[in-house]
Amino acid sequence: MANHKSSLKRIRQEEKRRLHNRYYAKTMRNTVKKLRATTDKAEAVAMYPGVQKMLDKLAKTNIIHKNKAANLKSKLAAYISKLA
């Protein structure tokens, strides 16, 4: 257990940040799964800008790595283009 006031505060901050990051990472994963489950091209095209925006914001705030965001966006765009 931490003994210093500052280290106790750091523990509180890290826990709060961890929960915040977990929430947004899970939300991102669910949104990507929902887009991948879509078989209708029009619906997928409508969803894609929102997913892309979410990935960019999460990469900007270091919740996910920028390369992971780029890879996901690329794969989702390829998936949408293959839909009939």
UniProtKB/Swiss-Prot annotation:
Pfam families: Ribosomal_S20p. GO terms for biological process: translation. One of its GO terms (cellular component) is small ribosomal subunit. The keyword Thylakoid does not apply. Keywords: Ribonucleoprotein, Ribosomal protein, RNA-binding, rRNA-binding. One of its GO terms (molecular function) is small ribosomal subunit rRNA binding. InterPro entries: Ribosomal_bS20, Ribosomal_bS20_sf. HAMAP family: Ribosomal_bS20. Belongs to the bacterial ribosomal protein bS20 family. NCBIfam families: S20 (TIGR00029). Binds directly to 16S ribosomal RNA. This is Small ribosomal subunit protein bS20. It comes from Phocaeicola vulgatus (strain ATCC 8482 / DSM 1447 / JCM 5826 / CCUG 4940 / NBRC 14291 / NCTC 11154). The lineage of its organism: Bacteria, Pseudomonadati, Bacteroidota, Bacteroidia, Bacteroidales. The gene is rpsT.
